[in-house]
Amino acid sequence: MKWIKLYEEFESLSQEMIDLTNKLKKYDIPVELWGTGKSKTIKHLLDELNGDECYLEESESKITRYIEFVGVKIYYTDENDVRWALKEDRQEFNDGRTRRRNMPSSVSEKMKFGEDPLVGAIRGIKEELGIDIKGHQLTKRRDLHYNGGSLSYPGLDTKYKGHQYNCQIEREQFDPNGYIEIQKDKKTFFNWVKI
């Protein structure tokens, strides 16, 4: 049985995924840790690359992932003047793993190459929460740049360029029960917190 299972797994690997795995291993990236704990899989990285959400740059000694993203803090003020902030509570993966992140933004979305940050913020809110936001509801906070690792891809150096916004939603956009983003591999849960 093990041999059949092994064959089935390799049969589904594309040449593109094999090439990416070999490229990462060339730089001693511990891809065997990916897809466990809080990390994503090589297939997730391949999907990001093919979706123009990131790119990889090789040098003699290392490989670096570059991403540009928008982060949006979402607020609601109710009829009693109580202010609420939306927070990501958790992600539940189809394989049974749960990941909790202390995200500085309510919604974070990787931008497509050449995408305007405001358009990326509106798209991200629609994709993650199902809310149609108008541009006037968003105010720019700041841009930021930083380097570091990634919980999603352990061992892979990543350089980030971010655009931060605040968003004030209206009563008809507010769901007191929060929101659930459903993707093919996971669900992400968002809850309101009184501030």
Name what the model sees in each region:
Residues 8-195:
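N-terminal leader/linker segments that precede catalytic domains of diphosphate-processing enzymes
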Residues 3-7:
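Short linear clamp-binding motif
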